[in-house]
């Protein structure tokens, strides 16, 4: 079996929180490392560096146009969210809202991951994220990663201290790339 040509694809990684030094951004580190190891070109959408508008609010849409362009050029998307109060983050939803309707995510293969402080993980937020993304036409692939008790998994250095979780996070790249280039 031939190895897929990972360099032929472009991936967009979406950080679904604007909190500095968040556990969600830490969970993306092994994924970003895996993309780099495999020489996969990628773009990171970091909402802390953007000024996105809430629906119905008039204003400058420069950053919305920027993320629409980035996502429209992607062959696949990796979407992350923390679980806040039993839900995906408002920031993750705001990013989705700024991608338009019909959404530029329609028809895009995606993998999703969530992090939560509780022992139940990010199951609720991932269910909601999957529903919303599917509704707008994204192809959400099986195998989401939910990181429970996230404060015990990632150290202050940002590194994942659980080899099983790190393997699953890195595996999201393979799931996505296998779909894009079977």
Positions of predicted regions on the chain:
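N-terminal beta1-alpha1-beta2 submodule of the flavodoxin-like/Rossmannoid cofactor-binding fold
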Residues: 1-101, 159-182
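A glycine-biased structural micro-motif
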Residues: 8, 106-107
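A short, flexible beta-alpha/helix-coil linker loop
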Residues: 17-18, 49-52, 112, 117, ...
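Short amphipathic alpha-helical patches
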Residues: 58-59, 91-94, 118-122, 136-139, ...
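Short, glycine-/small-residue-rich phosphate/pyrophosphate-handling segment
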Residues: 109-149, 163-164
